[in-house]
Amino acid sequence: MRLLIMGPQGVGKGTQAALLAEHFNIPTISTGDIFRYNIKNKTELGLEAMSYTDKGELVPDSLTNKIVKDRLAKEDCKNGWILDGYPRNAAQVTALDEMLADLDTPLDHVVALEAARDVLLERMKKRAAEQGRADDTPEAIAKRLETYEKETAPLLDIYEARGLLVVVNGVGDIDEISGRIISHLE
């Protein structure tokens, strides 16, 4: 199974991606996790990414596309994967389409998690307090939500037109949300 998991920051994409990966026995590819690992370890990639994320900006497509393409080509992705945090804009949709065509691996489903803005803000404030993520300042949170609404949310229409979109309420018990997603996919 090849899935995209989409939704605004704080909706629970990472949590649900991990549970779905375990359920379907496929890897999760989180561009955010890849970037955070590299930022934490101050790699060349991390320092480049940090120059954007510290200002609440998205990492440029050229960098993100390269990371995703390299990761999708790995052996553990042969039987499927879950992409979390990608694509985020129309240019990345086109890039992903090209990658999947090259790999001869069509996308199966796009899961869109939804939650009200006040729920998202509360979750991100809590995450910032618990995890101390540098990119969870109030200003960065507001900017990322605004960017999602402007650039990423419209992508759901593309996937809906392709018949791939599954919209799921991202509010409630974690296992309950997973159950909703799995019932749509199986």
Curated annotation (Swiss-Prot):
Q: Which GO terms describe its biological process?
A: AMP salvage
Protein origin, superkingdom: Bacteria
- Chain sites annotated for binding AMP: T31, R36, E57, L58, V59, G85, Y86, P87, R88, Q92, R133, R144
Keywords, A to Z?
A: ATP-binding, Cytoplasm, Kinase, Nucleotide biosynthesis, Nucleotide-binding, Transferase
Reaction catalyzed: AMP + ATP = 2 ADP
Q: Do you know which InterPro entries this protein is assigned to?
A: Adenylat/UMP-CMP_kin, Adenylat_kinase_CS, P-loop_NTPase
Please give an example of a GO cellular component term from this record. Answer: cytoplasm
Task: State where it is primarily located.
Answer: cytoplasm
Q: Name one GO molecular function term.
A: adenylate kinase activity
Compartment(s) where it occurs, according to its Swiss-Prot or TrEMBL record: Cytoplasm
- The positions annotated for binding ATP are G10, V11, G12, K13, G14, T15, R127, G172
Q: Give the EC number(s) under which this enzyme is classified.
A: 2.7.4.3
**The UniProt record lists the keyword Kinase:** yes
Q: Which intervals of the chain are annotated as region NMP?
A: 30-59
Q: Which family does it belong to?
A: Belongs to the adenylate kinase family.
* Function according to Swiss-Prot or TrEMBL: Catalyzes the reversible transfer of the terminal phosphate group between ATP and AMP. Plays an important role in cellular energy homeostasis and in adenine nucleotide metabolism.
| Quaternary structure and partners | Monomer.
Record's protein name: Adenylate kinase
Native organism is Bifidobacterium longum (strain NCC 2705)
